[in-house]
Design a protein with these regions (language model features):
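Cytoplasmic helix-loop-helix junction between adjacent transmembrane helices
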Residues: 99-135
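Structural signature of the two symmetry-related core transmembrane helices
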Residues: 70-84, 163, 272-287
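Helix-loop junctions at membrane interfaces in 12-TM secondary transporters
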Residues: 2-5, 86-99, 289-300
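Intracellular juxtamembrane helix-capping segments at the cytosolic ends
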Residues: 26, 107-122, 310-324
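Helix-loop boundary and gating motifs at the non-cytosolic
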Residues: 1-48, 207-246
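Juxtamembrane intracellular "pre-TM" segments in multi-pass secondary transporters
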Residues: 1-2, 176-212, 396-397
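Helix-to-loop junctions at the C-terminal end of transmembrane segments
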Residues: 53-67, 150-151, 256-270, 355
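Symmetry-related core transmembrane helices of the 12-TM Major Facilitator Superfamily/SLC fold
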Residues: 157-175, 362-380
Length: 401
């Protein structure tokens, strides 16, 4: 592992650690602070909706400035201030403001970090998966550490922990190589207008729109599993400790696939990875909809390597090969917004009423999303021939931080 890939691995690990601590316990922490379920839902939904505007704008500005590292430092600093404020916020309005700011800012870093990681993996010839895998490993570690801390000290420990981990995130981004001071020349307003114009050209590409819809439906199909999967398992009589064993099985499959991602990509290709990820979605969620026996659930958990990891790798390498480096952060932000924001948000909103009405059969909606993703993946395989999608797509790959 060279110096650049090592620094990126540290940044990915810090990012995964904060996610692993936040995801399972932040909703419970909000309840501990006295927020009602409706307030919690509104707060989390507001964060998702704001990401739709903030993440693409952050990506466009980072591309126009040709400085993704600086944008990540700004966003992580805002997130740190938000989580730090939660240690003292007792009024609902202040909790809303601080939590949403932290959620939106930390979420805006992810596509920027991915764009840098994927692009530099090509420039410095290392395996992107060997860097990205540390986010998955540290996410699992964050689950464990936060669980131990909450069990021992109560939910009140979460906000201080998140604040401390955000310091690690800021430090890990600061440790990345700084871009040359004179790299982005010319008037910023002119560069910003030029980036917007190229982004519009990208969004007029039918191939890119098919990709966005395909990848977003795949990732959005995880909404019921992420939001209500644990609750449904509890309703089936599974203990918290058993659920704690089942959940990481999917992460183990994800880690295994990420560790050999370059070989997988060379053999299968980006578009076929998206297709296989969609097939895994159809199979996984259809089986889960019928409440199979525990051994079957355990086996199906390993399909997370297909439903998430294959689709994610396919998306990352599609963007790498189809989008010019100067638009990398913009494309990554659009992908993140459509998948983690719009598709995941709408599917999460639908999951609650569907679960109340149909129980575990609500997984069939996720299966239908996977089927739509499969159709779009097949269209992508026919329409995309492996090249750049914009008129000015041919440019030298440069070490863009």
């Amino acid at each position: 592992m060279n110096t650049v890939s090592f620094r990126l691995a540290l940044a990915q690990a810090a990012s995964g650690l904060i996610g692993g601590m936040y995801t399972p316990f932040f909703g419970a922490w909000l309840g501990w602070k006295g927020l009602s379920p409706s307030h919690i839902g509104a707060l989390l939904a507001a964060g998702m909706l704001l990401r739709v505007a903030v993440a693409p704008m952050g990506g466009v500005i980072a591309d126009a400035r040709d400085d993704r590292r600086g944008a990540m430092l700004v966003f992580y600093t805002i997130a740190f201030c938000g989580y730090a404020a939660l240690n003292w916020a007792d009024i609902t309005a202040l909790i809303f403001a601080a939590a949403i700011a932290a959620n939106v800012a930390s979420g805006a870093v992810t596509p920027l970090l991915e764009s840098v990681s994927v692009r530099l993996s090509e420039v410095f010839r290392f395996d992107y998966g060997h860097v990205r895998v540390w986010a998955s490993i540290s996410f699992m570690l964050g689950n464990v550490l936060a669980g131990i801390a909450v069990s021992r000290f109560g939910l009140g420990v979460l906000a201080p922990w998140l604040s401390v981990v955000l310091i690690l995130n800021v430090a890990s981004i600061y440790a990345l190589p700084a871009p040359p001071a004179n790299r982005a020349r010319g008037d910023f307003a002119l560069r910003l207008r030029a980036t917007f114009a190229e982004a519009r050209e990208l969004l007029r590409s039918k191939v890119f729109l098919v990709f966005l819809a395909c990848a977003s439906l795949d990732q959005g199909s995880h909404a019921f599993y992420y939001s209500l999967g644990g609750l449904h398992w509890r309703a089936l009589g599974y203990s918290g400790s058993l659920i704690g064993i089942l959940w990481p099985l999917g992460l183990l499959a994800e880690i295994a696939l990420m560790s050999m991602s370059l070989h997988v990509l060379r053999v299968i290709g980006a578009a076929r990875l998206l297709m296989l990820g969609a097939c895994a979605c159809v199979l996984r969620w259809t089986v889960m909809a019928f409440d199979p026996p525990l051994p079957v659930i355990a086996l199906v958990q390993f399909l997370h390597g297909g439903t998430f990891a294959m689709a994610h790798l396919g998306a990352m390498y599609f963007i790498l090969k189809s989008v010019p480096p100067r638009l990398a952060a913009t494309a990554q932000s659009l992908y993140a917004v459509c998948s983690s924001g719009i598709a995941m948000g709408l599917a999460t909103l639908a999951s609650g009423p569907l679960y109340a009405a149909y129980g575990g059969r609500a997984y069939l909606l996720m299966s239908a999303m996977g089927l739509c993703s499969l159709v779009l993946a097949l269209m992508l395989m026919r329409r995309w021939h492996g090249g750049r999608l914009t008129a000015h797509g041919e440019e030298e790959a440069v070490a863009t931080i």
